[in-house]
């Protein structure tokens, strides 16, 4: 845009100055016209005039294009409050028109915020203007420390920021580009007028990934893992005690450590120190116990996946089947990754026999059918398994809890009744 221009008009003229972009309006008939308040920031600018006459002619033509009754031709679709409708007081009679001079100012592009410079007071004419030609305009200086000016202009920039916020729209930018008095210049780096609030020292703020609820969940998870680990160690120690007791029906004796290289105190075989000969055997038993626990965990995971239907296995004896053309039966269980799955056989007749894979317990059904094909007596367990399958999950948990706590005590009571239980079971199956 053009540079800011300071102009002093003749006493019989009135000028309204928008200093942010250098827009001027004037008239030679100010008796019934409005006097606009300076400091309104617009998005239009005048090309730097060469002399006072050129400036007056351009401003008068520009002023005549505006219909002050309907506000047609005004550069921005916005009405401003009137300051006064009375003509300004007449200045001193002998005051003559002064020449204008160009002052450096910031380059402003519509839509980009910039910091306006303060108004420069008029300079008194010197002898250089009388005997010599006007001094050529000084090139604009580069503002290398804009933050120093922002510190003192914080309160003055509030109105400027509000004005630019209303002017950075698509319609007003279109009006600015369509104005014949608009000149554009390349954009320059500017300093934002929005000041960030001062930061306070203290505890660092938690990131969104580590909210207080997630932190509490992590701590609770660590406690659960520690609790389970201690329980696993306790279970391994109890199983080790049970395994050792199988070798000593009369009770587990104490290990004195007399035959070892290093004399040790009396201790149990399930808690041998490293200097005892039974230390390596104790850890071998513990290692086997941990492998068995891991195997149980894998079996539990396999059962869970089979229950969800993630293990597609073709059944040995399908319950439902369909016969289709072999050209349509080209997808096997190994080629599909989303249920429902389908198993297909391609006989020589040209037709395919397809049957669906169960959506749940496919592997279990396959293993059960395979066992029934080799052990026919397993059919006797079908009613019992069907009855157990009808028990709710809560009943299973209660049964496991009762066996866990009362099982060892019931072992000494139930052996006499085991034959009776077997007899009742056979009667219930065959009758």
Curated annotation (Swiss-Prot):
Organism this protein belongs to: Woodchuck hepatitis B virus (isolate 8)
Q: Which residues lie on this side of the membrane: Intravirion?
A: 2-286, 236-286, 401-406
Q: What is its main location?
A: virion
| Superkingdom of the organism of origin | Viruses
Q: Show the disulfide pairing.
A: none
* Ranges that cross the membrane: 215-235, 287-307, 380-400, 407-429
Which subcellular locations apply to this protein? Virion membrane
So what does this one do?
A: The large envelope protein exists in two topological conformations, one which is termed 'external' or Le-HBsAg and the other 'internal' or Li-HBsAg. In its external conformation the protein attaches the virus to cell receptors and thereby initiating infection. This interaction determines the species specificity and liver tropism. This attachment induces virion internalization predominantly through caveolin-mediated endocytosis. The large envelope protein also assures fusion between virion membrane and endosomal membrane.
Summarize what the UniProt record says about post-translational modification. Isoform M is N-terminally acetylated by host at a ratio of 90%, and N-glycosylated by host at the pre-S2 region. Myristoylated.
Q: Where is this region: Disordered?
A: 115-147
User: Quick one: where's region Pre-S2?
Assistant: 149-207
Query: What InterPro entries does this protein map onto?
Result: HBV_HBSAG
Q: Where is this region: Pre-S1?
A: 2-148
> In the UniProt entry, what is the domain comment?
The large envelope protein is synthesized with the pre-S region at the cytosolic side of the endoplasmic reticulum and, hence will be within the virion after budding. Therefore the pre-S region is not N-glycosylated. Later a post-translational translocation of N-terminal pre-S and TM1 domains occur in about 50% of proteins at the virion surface. These molecules change their topology by an unknown mechanism, resulting in exposure of pre-S region at virion surface.
Per the record, what ranges lie on the membrane's Virion surface side? 2-214, 308-379, 430-431
- List all annotated glycosylation positions: 351
Q: Does the keyword Nuclease apply?
A: no
Tell me which Gene Ontology terms the entry assigns under biological process: caveolin-mediated endocytosis of virus by host cell; fusion of virus membrane with host endosome membrane; virion attachment to host cell
Write down a Pfam family by its short name.
vMSA
State the protein's name. Answer: Large envelope protein
Q: Where is the lipid attached (N-myristoyl glycine)?
A: 2
Q: Where is this region: Pre-S?
A: 2-207
Keywords assigned by UniProt, alphabetized = Acetylation, Caveolin-mediated endocytosis of virus by host, Fusion of virus membrane with host endosomal membrane, Fusion of virus membrane with host membrane, Glycoprotein, Host-virus interaction, Lipoprotein, Membrane, Myristate, Transmembrane, Transmembrane helix, Viral attachment to host cell, Viral envelope protein, Viral penetration into host cytoplasm, Virion, Virus endocytosis by host, Virus entry into host cell
């Amino acid at each position: 845009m053009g540079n800011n221009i300071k102009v002093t008009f003749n006493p019989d003229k009135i000028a309204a100055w928008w200093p942010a972009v250098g827009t001027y309006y004037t008239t030679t008939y100010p008796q019934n016209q409005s006097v606009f308040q300076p400091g309104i920031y617009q998005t239009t600018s005048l090309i730097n005039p060469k002399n006072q006459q050129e400036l007056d002619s351009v401003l008068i033509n520009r002023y005549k294009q505006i219909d002050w009754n309907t506000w047609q031709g005004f550069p921005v679709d916005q009405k401003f409050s009137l300051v006064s409708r009375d003509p300004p007081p007449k200045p001193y009679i002998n005051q003559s028109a002064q020449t204008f001079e160009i002052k450096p100012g910031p380059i402003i592009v519509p839509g980009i915020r910039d910091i306006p410079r303060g108004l420069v007071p008029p300079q008194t004419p010197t002898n250089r203007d009388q005997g010599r030609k006007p001094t050529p305009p000084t090139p604009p200086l580069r503002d290398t420390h804009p933050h120093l000016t922002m510190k003192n202009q914080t309160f003055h920039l509030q109105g400027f920021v509000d004005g630019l916020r209303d002017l950075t729209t698509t319609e007003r930018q279109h009006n600015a580009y369509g104005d014949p008095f608009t000149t554009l210049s390349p954009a320059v780096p500017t300093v934002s007028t929005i000041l960030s609030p001062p930061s306070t020292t203290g505890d660092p703020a938690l990131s969104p990934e580590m909210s207080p609820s997630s932190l509490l969940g992590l701590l609770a998870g660590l406690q659960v893992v520690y609790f389970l680990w201690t329980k696993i160690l306790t279970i391994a120690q109890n199983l080790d005690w049970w395994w050792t007791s199988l070798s000593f029906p009369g009770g587990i004796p104490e290990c004195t450590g007399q035959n070892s290289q290093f004399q040790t105190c009396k201790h149990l075989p399930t808690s041998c120190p490293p200097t005892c000969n039974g230390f390596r055997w104790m850890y071998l038993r513990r290692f086997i116990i941990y492998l068995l626990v891991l195997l149980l965990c894998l079996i539990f995971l396999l059962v869970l996946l089979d229950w969800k239907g993630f293990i597609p296995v073709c059944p040995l004896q399908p319950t439902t089947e369909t016969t289709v053309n072999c050209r349509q039966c080209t997808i096997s269980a190994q080629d599909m990754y989303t249920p429902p799955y389908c198993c297909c056989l391609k006989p020589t007749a040209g037709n395919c026999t397809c049957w669906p894979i169960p959506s749940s317990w496919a592997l279990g059904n396959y293993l059960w059918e395979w066992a029934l094909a080799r052990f026919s007596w397993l059919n006797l367990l079908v009613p019992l398994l069907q009855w157990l399958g009808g028990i709710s999950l809560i009943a299973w948990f209660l049964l496991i809890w009762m066996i866990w706590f009362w099982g060892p005590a019931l072992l000494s009571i139930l052996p006499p009744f085991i034959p009776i239980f077997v007899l009742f079971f056979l009667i219930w199956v065959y009758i």
